[in-house]
Amino acid sequence: MSAVRSSLAAVLLLAAAACRHERRPALRLWALGREGEVVAQLLPDLARRRPGLRVRVQQIPWSAAHEKLLTAFVGGAMPDVLQVGNTWLPELVALGALEPLDHRLARSVAVRADDYFPGILAANVIDGVTYGVPWYVDTRLLFYRTDLLAAAGFARPPTTWAGWLAALPRMQAAAGPGNWAILLPLREWEPPVILGMQWGAGLLRDGDRYGDFESPAFRAAFAFYLDFFHRGLAPLGDTAVVNVYQDFARGTFSVYLTGPWNLGEFARRLPAALAERWGTTPLPAPDGTAPGVSLAGGSSLVVARSSPRKDDAWALVEYLAEPAQQVQFYRLTGDLPARRSAWEAADLPADARARAFWLQLQHVRPTPKIPEWERIASAIARYGEAAIRGEMGIDGALEALDRDVDRVLEKRRWLLAQPRR
């Protein structure tokens, strides 16, 4: 009888444990855009490894993500794990919304710092503390028509900006009258910032307290940027290019400064006749030390400081960071992996078009890691467009840009001036 009672008690204990197991709430993961649509397809293997760890994915459109993140923080409704664009990370760190990860990274076998592109990893470190694990990477380089470059008399892409300035008018002529050489969308801040970095500009000064856009280095880069438009190499209006892919195929423009998402888009959208007539190349440099530097972009996975289940949240981050998951994620989304071992597993460096990104990612830098960067970037684009259209001169545009940036950074200066406690 005693044995029967013992067996019954054991069964009841197991049942109670199972009930508690089932009632355990799901870990919440917020993922953005296309990534949020497909990440659930990576999770079945995690469920097999850790039966008690359930994950509920919420997909958030990129257009609504920034406001939703801030609203969730204010309302105390942050998820456990979230995807964050690299330029948003400093803002969430300043709010105290994110969990520092260095102590977990130091013990992790799955996440190895030496397997990441250094410039991308650096974008996740704020004031010496790591807050994010890169999930996928993004940077900018040149897509170009190989046939038009050859028609211009160049066997391979130039590695200096001087070389491209010689090639672009010839490519434009080879494409025929009424066309342009290069597409640099007017409302993008990235081209002048990339050129500024290549020319050695710091963008901000005095500990990121003031704008530094009137510096000789940025002024030279900005003048070089404007020259593409003033020489008729790049279109001045948004209506000149109606459909990027159709116009690239027609030769409306021959070169495009853009990112890795267009690897898949070009392959899908260009006509079959152009399948072997386009390529990618790392950015040139002003002085011949190619590749020139580009931006350290992409998205990272972070753990909310408010999460009551930080160990489980970190387990999810580690899982999604595994090279095998990175490869599968690349196949689902076209997003370039953040880990170099995942690139090799997917044989990406062997693909000539992807290899250009592999090379470029060895030469990337993050934008200034301050919460105000998004507002500063918008101001750069605004004054850049005004100068392109001839509404402002170079000096007037940069003076106004510095003035606006100094206003944006006013609170930062005040906070940094306070005595440390």
Residue locations for each model-derived region?
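Extracytoplasmic/periplasmic substrate-recognition and gating elements
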Residues: 152, 223-235, 243, 268-335, ...
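Long, aromatic- and glycine/proline-rich binding clefts that accommodate carbohydrate-like moieties
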Residues: 119, 278-282, 330-382, 386, ...
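Short, solvent-exposed loop/beta-turn-alpha elements that line the ligand-binding surface or hinge
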Residues: 102-116, 181-182, 201-220, 268-273, ...
